[in-house]
């Protein structure tokens, strides 16, 4: 988080934010499932100005015997930001941040997967950020979870994610880029709504105990709204398949 330029107001006296949203309002979100033919499962998400695609391959045999687990599959996650995804061109390939976020996303997704059904195999998840606008980890988790469901991987529940944060002393939902850059805190959360389980909880910045509790509650509420959009995206795909089958008969 950076020092805020003089005169920049992230939230006005009417509670309107820099992009016109209210304090507890999500950015516009669009999701589509089954966007890549060559992957076992895939999903595309637009969340604000974020554009992210996720692909899943597997379960497939692990040829490196030393990596195999005799009792379960292993989940491998690669999160990557395309060089053109941000205003200042970044070097191709993984950097420290991408490696850290890959681990975070793996930890958020793993509790939802029934990996014991596929011993000695790997499930590989690739997340490519095509355009970045704050909140890429929660959008990446959301897209990856959809792609895993699309691949038919047995799951206890979908994983939905959202962040809350603090700007100019106010707890708000779903920070955009300016708010993330110049705000005081960011709290990404991932949940399995059916089980009421939290699979990811992080905090960047400074909050009081009361503010932290408020931010977590707000992020969970946001994630539940995201979960409904995930379900709608999956439903849309399978209704389309059913329609195609019906028409071909």
UniProtKB/Swiss-Prot annotation:
Known EC number: 3.1.13.-
Main location as per UniProt: cytoplasm
Annotated localization: Cytoplasm
GO molecular function annotation: 3'-5'-RNA exonuclease activity; RNA binding
Top-level taxon: Archaea
InterPro entries in alphabetical order: ExoRNase_PH_dom1, ExoRNase_PH_dom2, ExoRNase_PH_dom2_sf, PNPase/RNase_PH_dom_sf, Ribosomal_Su5_D2-typ_SF, RNase_PH, Rrp41
The keyword Zinc belongs to this UniProt entry's keyword annotation: no
This protein's record includes keyword Hydrolase: yes
Gene3D superfamilies, per the entry: GHMP Kinase, N-terminal domain (3.30.230.70)
UniProt entry keywords in alphabetical sequence: Cytoplasm, Exonuclease, Exosome, Hydrolase, Nuclease
GO biological process per UniProt: gene expression; rRNA catabolic process
Gene Ontology annotations for the cellular component aspect, listed alphabetically: cytoplasmic exosome (RNase complex)
Cited NCBIfam families: ECX1
Subunit and partners: Component of the archaeal exosome complex. Forms a hexameric ring-like arrangement composed of 3 Rrp41-Rrp42 heterodimers. The hexameric ring associates with a trimer of Rrp4 and/or Csl4 subunits.
Homology family: Belongs to the RNase PH family. Rrp41 subfamily.
Role according to the record: Catalytic component of the exosome, which is a complex involved in RNA degradation. Has 3'->5' exoribonuclease activity. Can also synthesize heteromeric RNA-tails.
Protein's recorded name: Exosome complex component Rrp41
The species this protein was found in: Pyrococcus horikoshii (strain ATCC 700860 / DSM 12428 / JCM 9974 / NBRC 100139 / OT-3)
